Amino acid sequence: MEFFSNNIFLFLILIISGLIYSRMTFGGMSSDVELINANGAVNLINSSPTVILDFRNPSEFDKARIALSVNLKKEDINSNNLNIKKIKKNKKILLIANSHFELYSIIKMLKDLNYQNIHVLQGGINSWISSDLPVENDST
């Protein structure tokens, strides 16, 4: 505890640097990837066919998910995966994940496979739920 109190300035710099790096890394993709809130996601889904890819762990996915979403692992993103191969390159894709850092690598992998119309649900499934939007679970 003494180390922390003696180096609080160092810890603040570390935290601020991490936040800036996170913002630059994820925010830097904003010209290519649209970050949308829950209502924007509803508009996206209702306006044209949208593939919803959920990269949370299976137990979280089983508890609450958006209807018709597909649960994948980051490792599933490759040109041989049937779930990925079925997605046409011009389809809109809505991504859901728990981590911005995980999303960064997922987006890069999808872009490497020539998917361009990528959207991210800001706040993940929690923002969807807090907007009182419907979810499915294994008991429904």
Residue ranges and their predicted role:
Residues 1-38, 47-50, 58-92, 98-140:
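Rhodanese-like catalytic fold shared by cysteine-dependent sulfurtransferases
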